[in-house]
Amino acid sequence: MKQMIIHGGKPLQGDVWIGGAKNSTVALIPASILSRTPVVLEGVPRIADVINLMDLLDEMDVRCEFKETTLRIDPTDIKMSPLPAGKIKSLRASYYFMGALLGRFGKAVVGFPGGDDIGPRPIDQHIKGFEALGASVKNENDQIIITAPEDGLHGAKIHLKMPSVGATMNIIMASVTAQGQTIIENAAKEPEIIDLATFLNNMGAVIRGAGTDVIRIEGVEMLKAQIPHTIIPDRIEAGTYVSLAACIGNGIRIHNIIEEHLDSYLAKVEEMGVVIDADEDSLYVYPAGDLKMVQVKTDVYPGFATDLQQPITPLLLTAKSGEGVVIDNIYPQRIGHIAQLQKMGANIKVADNIILAHPTEQLHGAEVIAGEIRAGACLMIAGLMAHGTTVIDKAGNILRGYDRIQEKLRQLGADVTIKDNPDVPGILDNI
């Protein structure tokens, strides 16, 4: 198990480059098996989830080559293979293989997905979408078995109860080779969905309306990759570095961003008093002065992203007065980081799943646990702010979502080391 050791209290400065979007990458890799020709993805982040997805592809005889930020995937010799629950349970995004396998083979056998522990994240909308396309779905021995009818999947009108990113992406992948037209109503509008649609359209799919709440897909016979696909920048990684820069930065420029993907987040940070200059594809975050508390409410895109409520929390602690409020309307139970911040001296608490933050003059180093990716990012920022040494256990969770994090932090001047905990078997050593 990984530990991140931070000797904090040092102002950081310099430049940082944002990697490709994790939430695109973890869908694009499974979607690659829909192609009958080799796929090239560029701008791929070096994160643990990518390595885990490559392992799952290996189970299906799909060859992968990952060099620097380019991932080559060759599915030409793919075989239909059940994906075991053991490997699936470490990776929530493995559920995208349901839609991808169903679209490619007309059948998917996938163990129940795992990933971050942030409360209930049911996949009932995914299942209802597959059933609307004509598939049968059953649960057996901790596996989901999805089977298309003998004459294949048929297009359908599917109305999502809520705009789920995962369900929208899975239905797109299953329906691109279905017969006829599929319409997804109340679809999620996240930039990562546009990225997936662009990738599939460049392989011959016919998808219109991605980025709106109604997506139309005309089924085609097969897909063939023709050109490399460059993944969009990671808006969550970018937002995390904005928070870090405002908390402990002495002037940091963040490169490779799409500002409009961060509109809701940047508006809230600037409401606090953080000064940011935006160029065409970069942001410069000035050293923060006196900041004021704000209220944060997460929402589906284009609202404030749930994945950024934890990274902004340390910034609230730097305000000079008042009470900051964080309400996560997407995952109300995403509060595990609060007890860990309290170990570091943070004046923060939870009441009825609402986070209440108060000015905290100084954090101190402590041993804390990164229960999931974004909680880990929150604690990482807090550790960089704190006096003394902070040890973050389960730091492998941070590596699941943040590209080359140790290297990037050191380039900004941070004293950070990631190592294996000698008391726990090491995993993900190749990240």
From Swiss-Prot:
Keyword list, A-Z: Cell cycle, Cell division, Cell shape, Cell wall biogenesis/degradation, Cytoplasm, Peptidoglycan synthesis, Transferase
Pfam families: EPSP_synthase
Catalytic activity as recorded in UniProt: phosphoenolpyruvate + UDP-N-acetyl-alpha-D-glucosamine = UDP-N-acetyl-3-O-(1-carboxyvinyl)-alpha-D-glucosamine + phosphate
GO CC annotations, alphabetized: cytoplasm
First-listed, main subcellular location of the protein, grouped into a coarse class: cytoplasm
Cysteines engaged in disulfide bonds, as pairs: none
Catalytic-site annotation from UniProt: 116
Localisation: Cytoplasm
Pathway(s) annotated for this protein in UniProt: Cell wall biogenesis; peptidoglycan biosynthesis
Enzyme Commission number(s) of this protein: 2.5.1.7
SUPFAM superfamilies referenced in this protein's UniProt entry, alphabetically: EPT/RTPC-like (SSF55205)
Signal peptide bounds: none
GO molecular function: UDP-N-acetylglucosamine 1-carboxyvinyltransferase activity
One GO term (biological process): UDP-N-acetylgalactosamine biosynthetic process
Similarity-based family: Belongs to the EPSP synthase family. MurA subfamily.
HAMAP family: MurA (MF_00111)
Function of the molecule: Cell wall formation. Adds enolpyruvyl to UDP-N-acetylglucosamine.
Name of the protein this chain belongs to: UDP-N-acetylglucosamine 1-carboxyvinyltransferase
